[in-house]
């Protein structure tokens, strides 16, 4: 059973995955309802929403972003990162893909919705196979420097983060033009406070026009913005494919 925002209901959620076509080649793990903490669709009543799975030990994860009170759930089926079997399976896949593709690092998407201690131990697990210099950058989309600082502390400085506050400073500068004080362009940014952990960006796939986090830096300012992140000593600059190729 699931619980909605107002009452406990009986629901049909699509939470069973057996992967018959794999024939257990890479994994014999089968996903069941108890490997998830929530779902975004009630098939019984054909409605979308946020439905929390009920059961022993079931709850939204702690160590996630505080937006909306608790931002564990994002969409579709929310994986339960407190379940030991889930943690073990994800760690195993992390090691597998890193070895199979001979990776030097990886980007972790939407980590504000993942339990911070899961991310920390996941990187420990992968680095146990690939070495301590295995690189990781996380997309923690929050423009508040204090939130990014707190996350960095929580995961023990084990992951770099995209400098979201810097992006928003650049967006503001491109909007205000001559009225913007360029002395503030690095104010309250990750690269100012944690230059060794900041991945500096101008735009990305989520900030471009028509996307979910639309805040596209105006075209006239982009050469200046890229000149800054590519030429300054601090931070690891990241060039957006869409800006380079159009």
What is each model feature region?
Residues 2-9:
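Short, small-residue-biased leader/transition segments that mark boundaries at the very start
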Residues 10-37, 92-246:
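Active-site-proximal helices and loops of the catalytic beta/alpha 8
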Residues 11-72:
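Core domains of carbohydrate- and sulfate-ester-processing enzymes
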Residues 45-53, 72-82, 179-186:
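Short, mixed-charge, low-aromatic patches
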Residues 54-100, 111:
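Active-site-adjacent "subsite" loops/lids of carbohydrate-active enzymes
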């Amino acid at each position: 059973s699931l619980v909605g925002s107002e009452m406990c209901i009986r629901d049909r959620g699509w939470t069973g995955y057996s992967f018959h076509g794999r024939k257990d080649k890479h994994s014999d793990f089968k996903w069941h309802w108890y490997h998830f903490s929530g779902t975004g669709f009630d098939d019984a009543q054909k409605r979308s929403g946020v439905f929390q799975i009920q059961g022993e030990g079931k709850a939204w994860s702690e160590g996630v972003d505080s937006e909306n009170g608790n931002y564990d759930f994002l969409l579709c089926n929310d994986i339960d990162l407190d379940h030991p079997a889930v943690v073990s399976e994800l760690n195993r896949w992390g090691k597998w893909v890193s070895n199979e593709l001979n990776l030097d690092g990886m980007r972790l998407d939407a980590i504000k919705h993942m339990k911070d201690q899961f991310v920390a131990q996941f990187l420990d697990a992968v680095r146990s196979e690939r070495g301590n210099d295995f690189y990781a950058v996380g997309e923690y989309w929050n423009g508040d420097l204090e939130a990014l600082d707190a996350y960095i502390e929580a995961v023990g400085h084990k992951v770099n983060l995209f400098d979201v506050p810097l992006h928003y400073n650049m967006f503001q500068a491109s909007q205000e033009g001559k009225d913007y004080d360029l002395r503030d362009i690095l104010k309250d940014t990750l690269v100012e406070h944690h230059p060794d952990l900041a991945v500096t960006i101008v735009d990305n796939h989520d900030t471009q026009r028509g996307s979910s986090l639309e805040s596209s830096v105006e075209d006239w300012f982009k050469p200046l913005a890229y000149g800054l992140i590519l030429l300054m000593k601090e931070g690891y600059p990241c060039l957006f494919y869409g800006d380079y190729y159009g």
